[in-house]
A protein has these predicted regions:
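Short N-terminal secondary-structure initiator segments
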Residues: 58-60, 84-89, 148, 228-232, ...
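Nucleotide-state-sensitive switch-loop elements of NTP-binding domains
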Residues: 2-128
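A general structural signal for short secondary-structure boundary/capping elements
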Residues: 54-57, 77-79, 130-134, 192-195, ...
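Phosphate/Mg2+-binding loops and adjacent switch elements
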Residues: 79, 83-184
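C-terminal accessory "lid"/substrate-recognition subdomains
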Residues: 137, 144, 153-306, 314-326
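Basic side chains
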Residues: 14, 149, 258-260
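Flexible loop/N-cap segments at domain edges
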Residues: 310
Length: 326
């Protein structure tokens, strides 16, 4: 059995990448989703019939280490999968995730085969300036880096960003194209090439750089970010969704770094297939679209009132509640 970690900062595109990657899945797979907020949304957006386990209300590298370990043990016993894909919270430090996963490497011989980091290249420099070492941690511990929103960035800017990334992590394999335009088989080929390069590097480097310590410090995200999440959401029209985009951009709810949700629709077009809006907001974009129930295999009856999650700083909870709740 192997563990694959698919990490990335808030809104980088981790869940979208996972859906792309697992679409060509040929092995028995289980996914662990970790959400910073109390309500898990990403599980509902995972497509296909792959088992998904949620660990919410914190980070699996810190306050939820015990839950994380127990989840992996339970998955091993129940499913005996060939691989476990872990999607940490967008505010997790990859170095801490690796410390926890190394326990299973030592105790059970489970290999951490890939440390994939999805980077929103459009917001890279802003995040680097705003979040410093906290943001750098994911990049410097990656074995593979893939870009989101690369089509929105000029080639000269891409080259400058690549130089900065190479300063942070000279050894990672960096895929310089849009991963959304390649197949899951091509993604697997990129990962396999990265694995071979890591093996070659180990053969020429005899120094032991494995950090086995499992001491867990206070999570820096607790000092930087806060989370607000709700169910029982009002029905929104398309006009309401456009207004939501403006409210987030102007700071009406506080400094929102990440927002996402599934919101009931009151549109006249609403039908059996289309009853909800899905929206996704990060530092560089706000997108919303109609979502069909058939595309939400993990959406159950308890979710029908909708879910909304906002992550940021100085969030105005009263305004958020009044705006979203019935």
């Amino acid at each position: 059995m192997i563990i694959q970690i698919i990490s990335g900062f808030l809104g980088a595109g981790k869940t979208t990448f996972i859906n792309k990657y697992i679409s060509g899945n040929k092995g028995k797979t289980v996914i662990i989703e970790n959400e910073f907020g109390k309500i898990g949304l990403d599980k509902k957006l995972i497509q296909g019939n792959i088992p998904v386990r949620e660990i919410n209300s914190g980070c699996i590298c810190c306050s939820l280490v015990t839950d994380f370990r127990e989840s992996i043990r339970a998955i091993m016993d129940e499913f005996s999968p060939e691989r476990i894909i872990i999607e940490p919270s967008g505010v997790a430090q990859l170095s801490d995730i690796l410390k926890v996963c190394n326990f299973f490497n030592r105790e059970y011989g489970i290999e951490i085969s890939d440390k994939i980091v999805i980077v929103d290249i459009e917001s890279f420099e802003d995040c680097l300036e705003d979040f410093g070492n906290f943001y750098v941690d994911q990049i410097e511990n990656a074995s593979v880096i893939m870009f989101s929103n690369i089509e929105k960035v000029e080639n000269s800017d891409i080259e400058r960003i690549l130089l900065k990334m190479r300063e942070i992590n000279p050894k990672a394999s960096i895929f310089k194209e849009d991963w959304r335009k390649i197949t899951s088989e091509e993604i697997e080929a990129i990962l396999e090439e990265s694995r071979k390069n890591i093996v070659k590097a180990r053969e020429t480097d005899n120094s032991d750089k494995t950090h086995s310590s499992e001491e867990h410090h206070h999570h820096p995200a607790d000092n930087i970010f806060e989370s607000v999440s709700f169910s029982n959401i009002k029905n929104f029209s398309e006009k309401d969704m456009e207004e939501l985009k403006e409210k987030i951009a102007e700071g009406y709810f506080g400094k929102v770094i990440r927002a996402k949700g599934i919101i009931p629709s009151d549109s006249e077009e609403s039908s059996e297939n289309f009853k909800y809006w899905h929206f996704d907001s990060n530092l560089s974009s706000f997108n919303f679209d109609k979502i069909k129930m058939e595309n939400l295999p993990n959406f159950d009856s308890d979710d029908k009132s909708g879910n909304v999650i906002l992550i940021g700083s100085n969030l105005k909870r009263n305004k958020i509640e009044k705006y979203f709740l019935k």
